[in-house]
Amino acid sequence: MNVTVDQSTLAGATRGIVRGGETLKEHRDRLMAATKATGRYAGLKTLELREREPILYNKLFSRLRAGVVDARETAKKIAASPIVEQEGELCFTLYNAAGDSLLTSTGIIIHVGTMGAAIKYMIENNWEANPGVHDKDIFCNNDSLIGNVHPCDIHTIVPIFWEGELIGWVGGVTHVIDTGAVGPGSMATGQVQRFGDGYSITCRKVGANDTLFRDWLHESQRMVRTTRYWMLDERTRIAGCHMIRKLVEEVVAEEGIEAYWKFAYEAVEHGRLGLQARIKAMTIPGTYRQVGFVDVPYAHEDVRVPSDFAKLDTIMHAPCEMTIRRDGTWRLDFEGSSRWGWHTYNAHQVSFTSGIWVMMTQTLIPSEMINDGAAYGTEFRLPKGTWMNPDDRRVAFSYSWHFLVSAWTALWRGLSRSYFGRGYLEEVNAGNANTSNWLQGGGFNQYDEIHAVNSFECAANGTGATAVQDGLSHAAAIWNPEGDMGDMEIWELAEPLVYLGRQIKASSGGSGKYRGGCGFESLRMVWNAKDWTMFFMGNGHISSDWGLMGGYPAASGYRFAAHKTNLKELIASGAEIPLGGDTDPENPTWDAMLPDAQIKRDKQAITTEEMFSDYDLYLNYMRGGPGFGDPLDREPQAVADDINGGYVLERFAGEVYGVVVRKGADGQYGVDEAGTAAARAQIRKDRLAKSVPVSEWMKGEREKILAKDAGTQVRQMFAASFKLGPRFEKDFRTFWSLPDSWTLPEEEIGVPTYGSRYSMDISELPDVHTVQFVEE
């Protein structure tokens, strides 16, 4: 197929803005029809430019890729928000005229797909005619109903023209501190519908002639709590987009529009072929099944929501069936996933499908050629009505990541089993950490301004272990592989919270032959804040990142907060006060130092806004990654080294690893080799003594299933999954040999089921045409 339009087909037609004269919709529809008919992007049977002029092709790639990375690094310095400047929470992507990405920068590359989804929505809904798409226009979007991850990711999108015709788009995204939601911070928890998610912008034209509209500036700054950060982050995005637009214009002027035009489409097909080749090289054909869970503990008194029907504990369910074929194609099917819920953890299909490439670029496709080709090379099935493909326009998305990171960790385990089978041991990953806790809140800050905070220290969690080495400690997040915990001094400038400690969170990484990387923890004291609130957000009752091949899960979360601490007087008197970290939460030391304080120490790791005053304490605990392999196979000296380094608590050396350690005169722990050998032999004997045949275990479990002997949350989860996933229910029945008379309707469980029978999709709104990206 020739991606350049045949001029003869346009005779008598209204001329569109795309190069060659097509309208945006005509252009995209033609490309998608050719893609569907041939299985190749845009019907490209050969990559003409790449094959005939490989030096020019690679020159274009190298120059443009370097340019988008340079734009990110330069724009990052404009940002005032530490989320952007410290953590690098931004990304720039270059798109062809059809809205498909051909190149992206480093950073939060999940937005390769989300900004593209916004462009495709504009194309599908004829933005070309109204409000119009012109050279030097500026568009803004954060609408999660059309593909964004959550409202705090703000897109700036700029069209690129050459000689009066549109040849592409460039998008920039930053994660902002506040979106004007019900609660302060970028990812509030108090709302249960999207109407409380904050400022919502649907591909709005906010500027022309490279100038933002005054009405937009006046409106947007008053819609959020953090006006200064909002305005400077917008300038960050615009600056990067304009740098990339200028680069494209220079490249076209030097290399010719024909070369650039071919590259803009061949690069996508190149990306698809690259993924297919890597799948063939690194995996084993077959069907892989795995599952992920995470808790939504909303029945607790410290979760205050406006609707009674949302006041219940539920569990997210994400079973994944991965099918790898001999030709290098593959299919990811999430049949059996639970329904969307009345909370802020739902996700759009694009955030689910686009986000997986953040991890894939670390293992499966470790290439700078990150674009929509990989998406075109993957078959996704996300059933309509599930939490990752909701069928109701009321759903909230504020913290989609709570479910996303917990669901994806299962996918990495499936891929890792395949890598392991092919011998790519260094690419094995036991799973990602649950990227939390999220310290958020707001009020009047130390500068007497209305403010909100969203600490991004959790951009540095532990990573999962591989099959050859331990995971990295306090190093990265699944949504930003280049994440950074940030400087304490910068966070103290942005937040009225003084650091009393920051240290490695011992034993937060999962145990194993290779240990998961540990997270870390920061103890913050409220100082010089007024009318201040904060809340917690993360996993607590469920460990969402399991280990692999005998490795242990990472530790789940908990909360520690202290009110009415009397710290002012304790400090004045020189008494001992909490400092450093909460090293062993089962044997706490801080609580005794604060005898009169109101302390909250429990597994309720999700709360809504809670009032805090000066001298109150808040522990921000970042999670670790899961482990790989049996802990009894770990080198004993590595366990001693972990204790000495603060990565493992001494009591777990014997309990988990079977390693006997002795403390030397120098205060360092060493290994008792003979004692260790005996301890490990005994643990193995104990395991055998406790074990039962699988058939016997299954018999007992089947009896529990027949009696419906499970917690309310578990029964509700499976009931919702059965209703949305009939094939999942059939497989479940077959596996457990259940009679036809056994049923599990939600109605018999005795919990509210609002949304399970009645829903209204966004596509039912007047003049709205959605874009479908997955099989539903």
Curated annotation (Swiss-Prot):
Record has Ligase as a keyword: yes
One GO molecular-function entry: ATP binding
Entry comment on modification after translation: The N-terminus is blocked.
Cofactor binding note: Zn(2+). The heterohexamer contains tightly bound iron, manganese and zinc ions.
Recorded effect of pH on activity: Optimum pH is 7.6.
Single Gene Ontology BP annotation: cellular detoxification of acetone
Matching InterPro entries: Hydantoinase_B
Protein's UniProt keywords contain Ubl conjugation: no
Alphabetical UniProt keywords: ATP-binding, Ligase, Nucleotide-binding
Highest taxon above the source species: Bacteria
Record note on quaternary structure: Heterohexamer of two alpha, two beta and two gamma subunits.
Function comment: Catalyzes the carboxylation of acetone to form acetoacetate. Has a reduced activity on butanone, and no activity on 2-pentatone, 3-pentatone, 2-hexanone, chloroacetone, pyruvate, phosphoenolpyruvate, acetaldehyde, propionaldehyde and propylene oxide.
Name of the protein this chain belongs to: Acetone carboxylase alpha subunit
Organism of provenance: Xanthobacter autotrophicus (strain ATCC BAA-1158 / Py2)
